[in-house]
Amino acid sequence: MENKNEKVEKFIQIGELAKKARVTPRTIKHYEDKGLLKPFKKTQGGFRLYQDDKVKLVERIRQLKKAGFSLREVKEMEEIDGIVEENIFEKVDDNELNKMIKFLQSQLIKTEERLNETIKVKKGLEEVIEFLKKRKRT
């Protein structure tokens, strides 16, 4: 009889991970090269196998890239996130915590600056649209 409390881990290959996360397999390999992602294991045939939950990680990386963060910044944020999720603060001294806080505060400032620039662009587009609508003959 099967134990209902046991979690059966599902593994997916690089193509399926890429498809689910809406990126290319080449992007997945690039993230691996940058240390952002690694396969759970490789088969004897050399196929990379990933845990199904890596889809969310790839989507988060893509989202942060789209928001203007470099892969280096994304990696640092993911490392901090891992410490928070695993609650392993006993392995981190106050000096390291201060570095993390400073880094995240600088990322927050950059995000606010990008957001303000995006709002300005949006307002400019809205003004041009309204101007053009007023010029229509019909």
Name the predicted role of every residue range.
Residues 10-27:
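Polyanion-binding surface elements
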Residues 17-18, 31, 50:
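Append "Primarily bacterial transcriptional regulators
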